[in-house]
Amino acid sequence: MIITNDRSSTHALEITDTELMATAPSIFAQAPMPGVSGRYTFLPTARIVDAMRQEGWKPIEARQSSPRLEARRGYQMHQVRFQRRDQVAEVDEFAPEVILLNSHDRSSGYEIRAGMFRFVCRNGLMVADSLIPAIHVRHTGQEIGAIIQASFTILGQLPKLADRVASFRSISLTNSAARLFAEQALALRYQDPTLAPIRAEQLLEPRRHEDAGSDLWAITNRLQENLLRGGMRDTTRLNRNGRPVRPMRAIRGLDANLKINLGLWEIAETVRLN
């Protein structure tokens, strides 16, 4: 489940605790999942959100994973995206963000990452460790201060985003290079491309005029949006019953979203260096 405000403008609205509870109730868990280690010290993520608000961060989007095991429900991984109230958007195109990940089901500790939100497509991107490394914080009971410090550490590195976007924009890809990038991107969702409902080159199709172009930044954004939003299909492909394949579904799960976002950025970095 996901909740976000209408970010068609460059001013993201802060979401309330009521909205957070409605879409990511694991943020408000009052205890860890039974059976956690005795070294685990519980602290509700909601308290971290409150502390972030006091430091000038506003939560603008939240989501949680869909656990396979019912025992993990209510404790599963969740994500909150924050923007600074005093942060100025980069030329009205994107706003830098700090992303908080956590769970209370023994699967992970706190993770603080850099991200950005593009206004034109209303998509959130996540920055890979190769540019701005994530900061990990264990559940010790003293993590509020460590997480606040980590958020400002990430904030201090956010200017790298504008520089990297400029670098991506300066690189023009040939048709063959763009197609190879698309094939690698499709593999993030489908290990066997023959089982995908689309051809890799379909991921290169822009959804709006602003995303047209052959530069690395434009192509990265087209691939990211098409992989996550789905809705595309290869009308020439048939399923096992000889019928046309169904359109590619949108990504709803948090784990898959993380895999695609981080993986795609890493591929883009490799393309940039080559």
Task: Identify the meaning behind each predicted range.
Residues M1-D6, D86-F94, L100-N274:
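Intrinsically disordered, low-complexity regions enriched in serine/threonine
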Residues Y40-I48, E143-A150:
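Short amphipathic alpha-helical segments
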